[in-house]
Structure formats: C-alpha cells, structure tokens
A protein has these predicted regions:
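N-terminal secretory signal peptides that target proteins for export/translocation
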Residues: 1-6
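Bacterial N-terminal signal peptides
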Residues: 8-20
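Soluble, non-membrane globular domain cores that form compact, hydrophobic packing
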Residues: 19-209, 213-335
Length: 335
C-alpha cells in the first residue's frame, strides 16, 4: 500500500515545485498595469556594498519594463527607510551629467530619462517620462510609502567651488567608512543621532573634502568637536549643533575660507496668538430662534406620526379605544 502511494506523492510534489518555479515573480514596487502600459518583465536587484545599503534601510530594489504598443521604457526603483535615506541613495546613485528637473524636489533629467525621489522611493525611468497624471497614478500604488521633510543639512554646503555630484549623505559608520575613511566613526559618534553631509571642493592645491556633522543639540556638538580636534590633518569648526571638518586640505588659506562660509542657520517657526472672535448678538438670537423653530417642527411631526399610527390601528387593525385613565387622589376620604 505504501509503495502504491509513494509514486503519486512524488509526482504531486514535483508538480507543486514546478508550479512554484514557473509562477511569475511577484512585484514589490512596480504594478502590473501602469495607465495604458503593461509590465512585460520584472527583475529583482541585489546591489553591492551591502553594508551601506543596509544602513540606508534598503527594503526593495526592482527593475521592470513597460510597453504600450511601440512605446517602451524601463523603470528602476529602490524603497528605503525614509526620505532622509532616499536623499542619501539619490546622491549616491545619481547619473553623471544629468540636469536638474522640476519633477520633484530632488530630480534630474536627461532627454527621455528621469531620476527622482518620491517619499522613501528613488526612481529611475529610461526611455520615457510619463506626465504628471500618469506619475500620480503610480504614486498612489506604491506600497509602504512614507512622506516627510528632507534634511536641511545639505543646504549648509558652500556653493562656491563645489564639485558637481560629489555630495554624499552619511547615516552611520558603514557609509562614513565607504565615502570618507579618513574620519573615524568614533569621532562622529553616530550613536548620539549624528548625520553628516560630505562634498568635494577644488582648491588651487588640490581637492578638499568638507564634512558637515549634525547633532540633535549644540551641547552634543560641543562635546564631539573635541574628539574631531584630536585628529591629525583636519581643520574643525563648530557652529550651533553642527561641526564642519575639512579633510586633506593642502591649502590652509582655502580651508579657512571654506570653513568661514559654514554657519548654522536655525529655522524657527511659531504660531502667533490670534484675538478670539467675539460673538455677534444678532447671530446668537437668530440661532436661538432657529433652534426653537426646529424643536417645534420636530414636536409636530412626532405628534402627527403618533396620531396617524393610532388612527390606522383603530381603523384597519381593530384596535379598541381605551378609556382615558383618570388619577384620583381621594382627598375627601381623609377628612
């Protein structure tokens, strides 16, 4: 009996495995249908530099091909932790020579190609750029979308002398070691909530790296600036909760001028107290009359409904008319 059952079980298991292998790959980012375009291929991506990607919180990476008649384009997407990580990936993976675009707050274009961020997604389109309406159709389908403000640290980089596409956003020891190994993670103290923005500058005597480290409070920055000051070959400055570090500067004057351009600008917002609106007595009286009138209408409607029910019951259902109950106090009996 067991021998008879063995062959069917083996065949069923083989069929199940074959079905699983033959089943189409399930997409984690790109939908099957995008407007009039149909997805014709899907590829899961496994990027290198796993330590950096893990620090940026990479969740999914996919490349898909879409077609609509003769029109065909390729879409690559990365989903990471949040908008800060999306900024870091955008700076790291951006193509060289592309121009700024208005597709989003962080966007580049090059002919029919686009590269931009949307929330915690980084998207690259090659061969066709859908219009705003079609892009919105994609955005509402993106799973686990998270929106938030971009970090303000990149805005503190001096513009003069900045090498294009040299910016790299640092979220921890792995990305710091990958992009600027001359600065030790122990000096940065990422466990205190630090983030950093680094960039390259051209001086008359060679390239210079500027690293801006941001901390939750000025007190933390004041403590860590002492650690950076212990390093050799660097020039350090603290401004507010931010530390500026120049690395590899062979031109001392250029390094000093570069540091002088870095100044923390606090962004403070508050709600102004507004004078309470005094009620208009005419409106108050009018509202009271409206409410009283509404109560009268409701009372009349309820009374008419009850009278209608009693009339219908007596006329068609044979309800007997009950005598009116009379309450007697019998006060004369107590005399």
């Amino acid at each position: 009996m067991l021998r008879r059952l063995r062959l069917p079980v083996i065949l069923a298991t083989a069929a199940l495995l074959a079905g699983l292998l033959a089943s189409p790959l399930k997409a984690a980012i790109w939908p099957e249908q995008w407007w009039s375009f149909k997805r014709t291929s899907l590829e899961k991506l496994t990027p290198g530099d796993q330590g950096v990607w893990q620090e940026y919180g990479l969740k999914e990476a996919e490349r898909a091909t879409y077609e609509d008649g003769a029109l065909k384009f390729t879409a690559t997407g990365w989903r990471v932790n949040d908008t800060t990580a999306a900024l870091a990936v955008f700076q790291w993976q951006r193509p060289q020579g592309w121009k700024k675009s208005s597709l989003s707050e962080l966007a580049l274009e090059n002919g029919p190609n686009a590269y931009f961020t949307f929330g915690n997604y980084v998207i690259r389109l090659e061969g066709y750029i859908p219009d705003e309406e079609k892009r919105q159709i994609l955005f509402v389908q993106l799973p686990r979308l998270e929106r938030g403000p971009l970090p303000t640290l990149p805005g503190h980089l001096p513009a003069a002398g900045l090498d294009a596409n040299s910016e790299r956003y640092i979220l921890g020891p792995a990305s710091l070691e990958h992009f600027e190994p001359r600065l030790p993670p122990s000096a940065a103290a990422f466990h205190m909530g630090a983030e950093a923005q680094i960039a390259q500058y051209e001086s008359p005597k060679g390239p210079v790296t500027l690293a801006l480290f941001s901390y939750p409070t000025p007190a933390m920055a004041k403590k860590q600036v002492l650690e950076f000051g212990k390093l050799s070959g660097v020039l350090v400055k603290r401004t507010g909760p931010m530390i500026a570090v120049v690395v590899g500067g062979q031109d001392a004057d250029f390094s000093e001028r570069l540091l002088a351009q870095v100044n923390y600008r606090a962004q403070v917002s508050w709600d102004e107290q507004t004078k309470p609106v005094e009620p208009n007595m005419g409106d108050v009286i009018l509202t009271a009359f409206k409410f009283a009138g509404l109560l009268m209408v409701v009372t009349l409607l309820v009374g008419a409904m009850m009278a209608g029910v009693r009339f219908f019951g007596r006329r068609y259902l044979g309800w007997e008319k009950e005598g009116e109950a009379l309450l007697t106090l019998h006060l004369d009996d107590r005399r």
